[in-house]
């Protein structure tokens, strides 16, 4: 076994010298297993990042280096970090190294483990079929539909509802489609991960989900690699079992952020806004593995934190290039009490074309967007001169646009304990017919508040009856 010694420790970055002259390869895992002077055991894994010359490698630690000292013996495992894959991962919670961190005991030693670094599928293996994934969330299904095997970004600043939307999607897809999900918590709050685990356990969804966490309090090495751990588990379900898998990453920005921290510690020159020079490469290596093949698909839904709501920041801008659909969350809508706060004009999808969604769906979606766009243009006039100065035609546009805006909101299953209202799953055909009828003026006489936080158009009629009673 190839052994070396720690020569330098800079927080999460550790230099190791191998005297035999046989250096471990880049991405190899090195381990330390011993106790320090206080009797506390040190059990650490490092990943080789650079060969410095002089028989020394620079590595990144996957957990805290507290208690580590120079001269500590390090062992080269001879392979990359590998994690458990297959049905054994379902219903369990893991860390970046594939160790179980729930209370259900360790994973059996003989279980299959795959390395977290691997090549993207070959070009000829990729599937070109385009199929819509129904989410049951009206604003998404109507205006920015998700593609099976596609990549979807949920963009938004702090506290606009990205994680709640992800939780609802996990719930809807498990309940309605019975699919397998892998959830990778990348650099987010431990409390949210804990809440999500307990909610999923209560609803029974956890049986179909594998969860991997590298939270905010962990070193950058773990936060940078945990997305690859989750992706490796998802790839096994796709390639070996032919499944259609959902991969949730919350939050992809923290992946970039961790990469930036590691890059600075490794001594690389920073590029724009202080990000790592390898930003586009690292993002590409992750995203290119998330795809549909002839065997199965991985549909990935990624929350993207937008620093200071600035979409031109290199981190969200680099992520944009890889996405098939974007769901933009807007703080202005949360202030109006419209949840989910999805911006119907800024959200996009490659799938919103008549060849994919059908002529009727496409026409209704475009009319909804035109009505909302016209309302947006009229808002300045209304603010200065008031509604009375508008033409009759424009008054009607405003009247319908407000109903459409409220009808795009919806009550979520995962928010039942906050709202006290039952969550709703709305099939696409009901969504399209509901908006078509609003555009035709069928519900012009109903009060606009009846359209708030409802599922189907039938609920609107019921609400209106209660209000008018």
Swiss-Prot record:
ATP binds at residues 156-163. It is a peripheral membrane protein. One of its GO terms (molecular function) is proton-transporting ATP synthase activity, rotational mechanism. It is found in: Cell membrane. InterPro entries: AAA+_ATPase, ATP-synt_VA_C, ATP_synth_F1_bsu, ATPase_a/bsu_AS, ATPase_alpha/beta_chains, ATPase_F1/V1/A1_a/bsu_N, ATPase_F1/V1/A1_a/bsu_N_sf, ATPase_F1/V1/A1_a/bsu_nucl-bd. It holds the Pfam family ATP-synt_ab_N. Keywords: ATP synthesis, ATP-binding, Cell membrane, CF(1), Hydrogen ion transport, Ion transport, Membrane, Nucleotide-binding, Translocase, Transport. It catalyses: ATP + H2O + 4 H(+)(in) = ADP + phosphate + 5 H(+)(out). Its EC number is 7.1.2.2. It comes from the Bacteria. Produces ATP from ADP in the presence of a proton gradient across the membrane. The catalytic sites are hosted primarily by the beta subunits. Belongs to the ATPase alpha/beta chains family. This is ATP synthase subunit beta. It comes from Bacillus mycoides (strain KBAB4) (Bacillus weihenstephanensis). The gene is atpD.
